[in-house]
Amino acid sequence: LINLEGALTEEGYAVHKDNSFRGPTSYVNILTQNSVEAVTLANDHSMDYGQKGYDSTKAVLDTAKIPYVERDSSTVITTKNGLKVGVYGAVYYKMDVDQISADIRKLSKEADIVVFAPHWGYENSAQCNSDQEKIARAAIDAGADIVYGCHPHVLQAMEEYKSGVIWYSL
């Protein structure tokens, strides 16, 4: 599972922001050659090249048969060696702890392992914040096995909580 922080496209125009990220569509081969089993697009850069860039990214992933979580909160289930892994991705501006808990409870009924992949926290902060802790623990309480956080661009704490593992930022 990776957080695809940008678009795979030759289309679209960069949005007006400090950093806009994209790679050519051929970069999907890097993912397939390195056994990437799923991708989350639930981040602040998946729309860097507008709707055309986002649609191109999804089409390239579809062609490569790499399942993905959409940019706003959504889920995907992928099967590897008979094991169903459910991934739930969410972006900080769409995080409602009650909705996340309900979605994870539902996903845990369909998957053997549930990974919650939030895009959250403060950039360049090595400390997780109280909202991250609250949401991560609620996700585990609801049935997630792993919390795989991204966004701060630095490592944050790892915590074993009840029967789950939380990486606040990798």
Predicted regions and their residues:
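Acidic, metal/ion-coordinating pockets
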Residues: 1-170
